[in-house]
């Protein structure tokens, strides 16, 4: 049966979730698919417009309802604002933000170009801030108080935020560590508004991008020698954690960091 989404004016009867970097082959797409399965009206945003449309079409065909897809460069503060305005225009609400956009280039500190350093911080950390900054005022308007959380923000960080023994990843580690600090402060400021903000820090997650870079032996060695559960993580592992954290079952959880690494690097 084709589901027709009920609307009253410009309000949808479904909770609305905006996911950044949502249309690739990795974590973002897995999160988008899971939230769609959970019943959310998922807004698919990505720098790659074609892939946005393809994922929206895939989900629309599967669930019999339309999914909004919008191109987005999270480093552009004004562009983020335009996307948020469009979401509110289409749905009249925004309940969940998942900040998943990230970028990395491995260079040793002694040789790292200022461009590499800045671009990594722009995408990973500043992009997360840009989205939070535009979304929070709208979430606060709809607050129902701390007893009934009105909205949720999930920031995707990495175990690289504290596992700094990884060589050539200073920019990425710095950006991801910054996300954790931003998460905690934003959570402290906005709990009174009924807004929960948490971070998820994945370990090695198998995806098509990494598969093109590393041989199979790399993943096999990681699973055998580092993972406590004997395997490499999958995008769905992260999506499952996000699914729980945005649900009402996680209503008492905010300002926390959740590690999804197979026990490789538990966060102290």
PLM feature spans:
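Short, small/polar-rich loop/turn modules that mediate ligand/substrate recognition or access, typified
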Residues: 191, 196, 253-255
